[in-house]
Amino acid sequence: MSETEKIEEAAPPYLCEEPPEGAVKDHPQQQPGMISRVTGGIFSLTRGAVGATIGGVAWIGGKSFEVTKTAVTSVPSIGVGIVKGGVSVVTGSVAAVGSAVSNKVSGKKKDKSD
């Protein structure tokens, strides 16, 4: 018996089976749109979205993803996310969002010669 077969036998049946059809009705699928705010401070931007929220998240780009005030999220495209008090840059597949970045990001400063 191979290791793969041993792992499949060790997994409980409820992990291997498909969820019943009625299980999805409690958590409906999110429909495409510009920006939707969900309770608890979670912001969601969906495909083709360009948008901003006051005191929340501003993001420009494609594919859908969800961001919380401190989250690490998988994003299949390139873009920039901004959180009040912090900045997040999305490059490739991972975005880290949080206020801990705010001390490392500063605005454009003028030279003394200007």
From Swiss-Prot:
GO terms for cellular component: membrane. The keyword Transmembrane helix applies. Disulfide bonds: none annotated. It is a multi-pass membrane protein. Pfam families: UPF0444. The keyword Hydrolase does not apply. The gene is tmem263-b. Keywords: Membrane, Transmembrane, Transmembrane helix. The chain crosses the membrane at residues 40-60, 78-98. Residues 1-33 are annotated as: Disordered. May play a role in bone development. It comes from the Eukaryota. It comes from Xenopus laevis. Its main location: membrane. It is found in: Membrane. This is Transmembrane protein 263-B.
